[in-house]
Amino acid sequence: MTAPKVGINGFGRIGRLVLRAAIEKGTCQVVAINDPFIDLDYMAYMLKYDSTHGRYAGDVSIKDGKLQVDGNSITVFAHRDPAEIPWATAAADYIVEATGVFTLKDKAAAHFKGGAKKVVISAPSKDAPMFVCGVNEAKYTPDLDIISNASCTTNCLAPLVKVIHEKYGIEEGLMTTVHATTATQKTVDGPSNKDWRGGRGRGRNIIPSSTGAAKAVGKVMPELNGKLTGMAFRVPTPDVSVVDLTVRLASETTYEDIKATMKAAADDSMKGIMKYTEDAVVSTDFIHDDASCIFDASAGIMLNSKFCKLVAWYDNEWGYSNRVVDLIAHISKVQ
């Protein structure tokens, strides 16, 4: 079966890393990129050099008005309106909507006017069905034309929650994500009418913030709807975040048994999605880790046989971008 042909709308952090991941994995072929704010020369530069993930190891060049990456010829568009992007001229069937702007179904549907067949939104969506690899991707059906890959935090939390809930049952839980800074934050204090704290300078503050990541687990695992919620602390690091899940279990257990359960999942049912470590790790140890969730066995604690705190790391850029590629590869095989 030939690799699905992919177009990327928005060549920001996720857009560029989805391209890297697609080429590295070889399961998807990126044939087109649309970004009205970046010209072709700058696009090549931004792909080649990355302050967090390092210089691109392959060949990046420009030929005949197209971006050339490791022998892949990629058509480049510069349209602000998704409805004007001629995806069909580049044979792009699967569109990664990575602008962060067109996250509602009616907005994302504009891609169909240019010939797209499926749209995967690389962000949470209020009305598009959300899928998390390793959790509920098997529920995807071919009639779904617009779907969401959820958020990077939900991609870390949901596999962790799935393993725990299936073994012990979850009565209720609170999640905190200590989250790396992102491009939407201010470098220095600036106006942010909807979120006053979010307008404070990202380089010198720990900033409490809201997140729908925990509630979103209820959308991919309906049996947990209403049982989880959470919040975030934005911290001045460029990449890698960590989930802190405090959870009340339905059945009694020990922390040693939880560790064994998580390790078994990482080695089997969640292989490729989840990893397990007992090492004395810190955040930079997971830069460019392609897992959705790395369970930190040495960081968790247990108050009693039904109440525990579980810790899991994730590269909120690279791990998530790999799941976007995996999700496209999966849905392309579902007929």
Swiss-Prot record:
Pathway(s) the chain acts in: Carbohydrate degradation; glycolysis; pyruvate from D-glyceraldehyde 3-phosphate: step 1/5
SUPFAM superfamilies: Glyceraldehyde-3-phosphate dehydrogenase-like, C-terminal domain (SSF55347), NAD(P)-binding Rossmann-fold domains (SSF51735)
A Pfam family per the record: Gp_dh_C
GO molecular function, one term: NADP binding
UniProt-annotated binding residues for NAD(+): R13, I14, D35, R80, N316
Swiss-Prot/TrEMBL keywords: Cytoplasm, Glycolysis, NAD, Oxidoreductase
SMART domains, sorted: Gp_dh_N
Reaction(s) catalysed (UniProt annotation): D-glyceraldehyde 3-phosphate + phosphate + NAD(+) = (2R)-3-phospho-glyceroyl phosphate + NADH + H(+)
InterPro entries in the cross-refs: GlycerAld/Erythrose_P_DH, GlycerAld_3-P_DH_AS, GlycerAld_3-P_DH_cat, GlycerAld_3-P_DH_NAD(P)-bd, Glyceraldehyde-3-P_DH_1, NAD(P)-bd_dom_sf
EC number: 1.2.1.12
Similarity comment: Belongs to the glyceraldehyde-3-phosphate dehydrogenase family.
UniProt name for this protein: Glyceraldehyde-3-phosphate dehydrogenase, cytosolic
Organism: Chondrus crispus (Carrageen Irish moss)
Gene coding for it: GAPC
